[in-house]
Each structure stands twice: as structure tokens, then as C-alpha cells.
Amino acid sequence: MPFPSDVIYRINLAWINTVDDLTEILRKHKNHKIFLDLPIRRTKPPENRYSIDNLMPIIKNFLNIRYLAVSNVNSRDDVLDIQNKLPDNITLVPKIESILGIENIKSITDSVKNKEKIIMLDHDDLYRSVEKDNEPISRFQNSINILIEFCKENGIVLLRTRGVIFSDD
């Protein structure tokens, strides 16, 4: 199925087995902007098979890669570790999946150097985090509301994982 030319193609690297597989996908979609989603400290299968260092040659060679989401961001240190390695043309997107990440959202977003600030919220993982920490379930929705309000007040784009587009390529 062809995608419209203005689609930003998200690639969840948890599901890409090798760097060669990623390279093949990127070649196939060379005319689309690419949003890479790098799982770090993943707690559910599949496990990530490579690091940001493994990806740097690819990120530097494929200029259509515009965004890099990094999962399980809980502090500004999580952002700085990766951001210092990225070329300036890549927008780093911290992916928030825990109450701790929401509690630290100001320092996280302040540490992102990109002009356009974007964060990503994974509802499912946030819910699991609330359950795992034996927090009241009401904390889940309250935390989402806090994050939404923070983003509105600070001009930050909030991407919310609410659905998936499936593809066989």
C-alpha cells in the first residue's frame, strides 16, 4: 500500500532484527520522512538488539531520518546521553512511559536542544507502570492530564500512542 508523500514513517526498532533490515526499509522509503523509535530499557518482548552507537552510521547516511524517539525517558540524563551523539538535523523525542518521567517532564524538555519540542506518551506502558508501583489507577489519568496541560502551557507537541498502522513492508 503506497503512503501519501507527506506521511512520516515511524519505524519501531524493537521489531527490526538487524541493522541490515533497517537499512533495507530506509532505502525502500527514501522519499518519506522517517521517525525512528529506539527502545531502551525495554521490559517487554522483543528486546532491542542494538544501541544508539550501532545506529549512528545509519542516522548520518539517511538524511530523511528526521526524528528519533527514545523510550523509557525518566530524567534529563536519559536525554543528554543520546542527544550529544545526534546530528543537529535530528529531532530527539523523549518517550514518557512512567510516573517518574512525568514528574521530571520540565527538566526533560528543558534538556532537549531542538527548537521544536516533541514528547511521546505511551499510554499502555504508563498504565503498566502505575500498576507495577501499586499506585491507585486514578493516578494514571491524573498523570496524563498533568502532561497534557504542561505541553499546552509550554508549546510542546505531545504525541500519544493511540493506534497503529500495520504494514507488510
Describe each model-derived feature in a short phrase:
Residues 1-169:
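Non-catalytic helical/linker scaffolds that mediate oligomerization, partner binding
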